[in-house]
């Protein structure tokens, strides 16, 4: 029996940590401060992981990459996405497409958007669209205290 495609939603928010490398949308932004976190702090990749996992009915990033699990300490977003793809494949799914939007003032990602889309698409083996917005000075992202991201993903059955 053919299963209908499934859609998942993911969000992530991290505070900025001065002096920490800035990984965002799978890319290093050397001139910006990165986000604090158990892994590399890439809010966009973390939101994508959550979206894909939830679409496949496999929980969320906290269940898979728990902060109390030393195996995932400092892990790259790329490795996280690769692991998520393995998990959903084992459960009979593949990613159809995904969208991720970064919410924050810095770093500006527009000039690297196509590069980010290529990197993330390669990691998920599916088209990924990347966009960004600000909150017009409101909240922790508007004050430059943190970054956020929201993502959606569509998964389809392999069976």
Curated annotation (Swiss-Prot):
Cross-referenced InterPro entries: MECDP_synthase, MECDP_synthase_CS, MECDP_synthase_sf
UniProt similarity note: Belongs to the IspF family.
Subunit structure: Homotrimer.
Cofactor(s) needed by this chain: a divalent metal cation
HAMAP family, alphabetized: IspF
A Pfam entry, by short name: YgbB
Its biological purpose: Involved in the biosynthesis of isopentenyl diphosphate (IPP) and dimethylallyl diphosphate (DMAPP), two major building blocks of isoprenoid compounds. Catalyzes the conversion of 4-diphosphocytidyl-2-C-methyl-D-erythritol 2-phosphate (CDP-ME2P) to 2-C-methyl-D-erythritol 2,4-cyclodiphosphate (ME-CPP) with a corresponding release of cytidine 5-monophosphate (CMP).
Pathway the protein contributes to: Isoprenoid biosynthesis; isopentenyl diphosphate biosynthesis via DXP pathway; isopentenyl diphosphate from 1-deoxy-D-xylulose 5-phosphate: step 4/6
Cystine pairs: none
Site, Transition state stabilizer: residue positions: 38, 134
Name of protein: 2-C-methyl-D-erythritol 2,4-cyclodiphosphate synthase
Lineage of origin: Bacteria, Bacillati, Actinomycetota, Actinomycetes, Mycobacteriales
Annotated source species: Mycobacterium tuberculosis (strain ATCC 25618 / H37Rv)
